[in-house]
Amino acid sequence: SDWPSNINHGDDFTSTLNQAIINDEHIPNTRLTACDSPSIRSGTDILLFPHNIRLLSISMLDIPNLILFLKNEIPNPFKFKEIEKMIFLVCGHQKRDDRCGKCGPMVLSSVQETISNKRMSDQVEVFKSSHLGGHRFAGILVCYPSGNWYGRVNPSNVEKY
């Protein structure tokens, strides 16, 4: 991807949403990460965990209501789909850290190949993600809905995960 070194600085959707989350002290323990999952329609789709839903076609104009929803102050006002597959995120954020930029694509390819070989494509989706933290442990793999984080993943040990 061509994510800048810090996806949270700028005037795009991701930066604006992240700033709104940071500025609201009533949204604790929330992390915003970009991934290369394509949006189903126009706007931005948001994979929301642990809710296990994909919010569909969210725009800049939706951010105030999204913040209210994240704070549980309003019911979900957005179109959404249940996430029925496991989601694996592999950090491949080259501009943030070279280690993830080098390890990530190899791990991503190996995970995709393993899923295909095990005929699990109907159960798992794999995406490259922006910075997940802990780049000294690259390759980093995060699995949802379990929320398990794995570090130092490499093509030779992918099948363990």
Residues covered by each model-derived region:
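Histidine/cysteine-enriched polar flanking segments
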Residues: S1-Y161
